[in-house]
Amino acid sequence: GKALLDLDGLPMIVHTAKRAQLSKYLKDVYVCTDSNEIIKVCKKNNIKTIKTHKNFNNGTERIASVAKKINEKIIIDIQGDEPLIKPSYIDKLVKIHTKHKLRPEIIIPSIETNYTADDTNVRVLSSLSGRIMYLSRARVPHQYKEFIQSISKHVSVISFDKKALVKYFQTHR
């Protein structure tokens, strides 16, 4: 799969994990996967892994399934196909989440964009109050168009409050 694509002599997942390990604030970086081949590659490159089941609808369910095993209050989900993720970007996200007075359950960073036809990127639709209403690769459903403030591009990193992630997993399985 895509995570094992060779980039300059190393699989994409290794590049992504090594970039995450450069973060000042992440104590541990784990690759959560159901693939024995990915686990083998990660172990060879000194990257911690957690073996998961195969039957998940999305990456959030996969991360949520292992959240109880991780002794942290905040869990950062970095998609495995982000080999150019900037460690400073991860650090900024962690700082925002830990310093926020209301301690949000989830922070999904995005980039403002004006594209609407590209189905390869995840769109983030925000309400007029700034709350996320919709995340999807699909085009914006017509019924939402009058209620949205902007369409943004999701940047493949999400910060979760661990308790919220565990609750999500319990209610969506």
What spans do the regions from the language model cover?
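Alpha-helix N-cap/helix-start capping motif
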Residues: 10, 35-36, 87, 162
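Nucleotide phosphate-binding site architecture
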Residues: 5, 39, 166
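Short phosphate-binding loop-to-helix
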Residues: 30, 36-95
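Conserved acidic residues
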Residues: 27, 73, 103-105
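N-terminal glycine-rich phosphate-binding loop and ensuing alpha1 helix
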Residues: 1-33
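Conserved core of the sugar-phosphate nucleotidyltransferase
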Residues: 85-172
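Structured catalytic cores of enzymes that bind and process phosphorylated ligands/cofactors
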Residues: 19, 23, 75, 106-107
